[in-house]
Amino acid sequence: MSVLPCSINTLKVLYDISGVEVGQHFYWQIGGFQVHAQVLITSWVVIAILLGSATIAVRNPQTIPTDGQNFFEYVLEFIRDLSKTQIGEEYGPWVPFIGTMFLFIFVSNWSGALLPWKIIQLPHGELAAPTNDINTTVALALLTSVAYFYAGLTKKGLGYFGKYIQPTPILLPINILEDFTKPLSLSFRLFGNILADELVVVVLVSLVPSVVPIPVMFLGLFTSGIQALIFATLAAAYIGESMEGHH
């Protein structure tokens, strides 16, 4: 007879833990609008980290690079190679866009894997990595969509829309639908992976000693980096595809 109360208590504990998964949003009221303050705060932190580290590393550029300058030159070379591989010979103007996407997502993801934002106590709501919020990932995906439309129209003019009836006009609905599925897949893939990783870290830190979650955190760092690479690679591939034609 004691099985039922025990099961109910177990379910209650699991339900309480699942509350971390849903979370509480931290809002600012600006005029008549509710703003997701947790996204703005953590995004500002990420931007400050990127700008601060870049400024410190290259404030005194040397002919023979120092450690910091050498690291950022390596990152730039990596992003240039990625852009050239996916976009082609006309990759140059798109390096800043692809680089910004990659670095912002990479540092945002790592902040979620290294910093248990949700444990930070606030009067109400909670903090989370920027990419833990669906609004951020959707915004990044929409920026990518705008970028590849702009790239295609700039290269081909109105002839860009001819891709929708290739190789046959019968595929017009599917080709149009593809433009909606691209940002959806980009945004939900990034959001789902980062949310799951951050929740695992938060739950383990809450339930077990701090040493135990370390392997999970290292795995989170790896997957976070992979997700940033996937997003940047797909963004560059979409831009390259829009400039070259429909494949």
Curated annotation (Swiss-Prot):
Membrane topology recorded in Swiss-Prot or TrEMBL: Multi-pass membrane protein
SUPFAM superfamilies referenced in this protein's UniProt entry, alphabetically: F1F0 ATP synthase subunit A (SSF81336)
Transmembrane segments: 38-58, 95-115, 134-154, 199-219, 220-240
A family per Pfam: ATP-synt_A
Major localisation: plastid
MF terms in GO: proton-transporting ATP synthase activity, rotational mechanism
PROSITE patterns referenced in this protein's UniProt entry, alphabetically: ATPASE_A (PS00449)
Localization terms from the record: Plastid, Chloroplast thylakoid membrane
Highest taxon of source: Eukaryota
Keyword check for Ion transport: yes
Keyword Membrane in record: yes
Keywords of this entry: ATP synthesis, CF(0), Chloroplast, Hydrogen ion transport, Ion transport, Membrane, Plastid, Thylakoid, Transmembrane, Transmembrane helix, Transport
Gene3D superfamilies reported in the protein's UniProt record: ATP synthase, F0 complex, subunit A
Subunit-level organization: F-type ATPases have 2 components, CF(1) - the catalytic core - and CF(0) - the membrane proton channel. CF(1) has five subunits: alpha(3), beta(3), gamma(1), delta(1), epsilon(1). CF(0) has four main subunits: a, b, b' and c.
Xref: PANTHER family: ATP SYNTHASE SUBUNIT A, CHLOROPLASTIC
Biological role stated in the UniProt entry: Key component of the proton channel; it plays a direct role in the translocation of protons across the membrane.
Family, per entry: Belongs to the ATPase A chain family.
Protein's UniProt name: ATP synthase subunit a, chloroplastic
Source species of the chain: Buxus microphylla
Upper classification of the organism: Eukaryota, Viridiplantae, Streptophyta, Embryophyta, Tracheophyta
Gene this chain is encoded by: atpI
